[in-house]
Amino acid sequence: MASRGVNKVILVGNLGQDPEVRYMPNGGAVANITLATSESWRDKATGEMKEQTEWHRVVLFGKLAEVASEYLRKGSQVYIEGQLRTRKWTDQSGQDRYTTEVVVNVGGTMQMLGGRQGGGAPAGGNIGGGQPQGGWGQPQQPQGGNQFSGGAQSRPQQSAPAAPSNEPPMDFDDDIPF
């Protein structure tokens, strides 16, 4: 089976400004946000703490764009899953320009994190094709967070019933000999 590659971006960061929303001729919403992610480390030579911030352009489409425009504000913390896209455009002087963005389409996810800052969505709102939570390799969803996925219809979360175990419960009250 031939591999086509993987193009997936996961970001957790804070908005640098309020979302910019516009509408396409077909009525679909498009929201542009800038997301800051920061990394901290201690400089081995000086012992001083250093920090580097990266700014990411993120484009949300459809219902996700509408949700972002209504609930996200400058400083909001958000979890994003999308794809990298580079697009070409021509500036006013006729020069070709390129920009790389994280595009969040139907298969992507936007989840608001943190508390309700100045009135956010009610806790537990879930729109679209959210995936079951938990398991290895999947992001842990904070309690009370609001997850919005790009699916067109709302699906209830389904959890698998716990498999019965034949093992006795673990007893942690034993004395440890060391």
Swiss-Prot record:
Per UniProt, residues of the SSB domain are 6-111
What function does this protein fulfil?
Plays an important role in DNA replication, recombination and repair. Binds to ssDNA and to an array of partner proteins to recruit them to their sites of action during DNA metabolism. Acts as a sliding platform that migrates on DNA via reptation. SSB or its 10 C-terminal amino acids stimulates the ATPase activity of RadD.
Q: Name one GO molecular function term.
A: enzyme activator activity
Summarize subunit and interaction data from the UniProt record for this chain. Answer: Homotetramer. Interacts, via its C-terminus, with many proteins involved in DNA metabolism such as DnaG, HolC, PriA, PriB, PriC, RecO, RecQ and SbcB. Interacts with RadD.
Q: What residue spans carry the Gly residues bias annotation?
A: 115-137
Which stretch carries the motif Important for interaction with partner proteins?
173-178
In Swiss-Prot or TrEMBL terms, this protein is called Single-stranded DNA-binding protein
* Bias (Low complexity): 138-165
**Keywords per UniProt:** DNA damage, DNA recombination, DNA repair, DNA replication, DNA-binding, Phosphoprotein
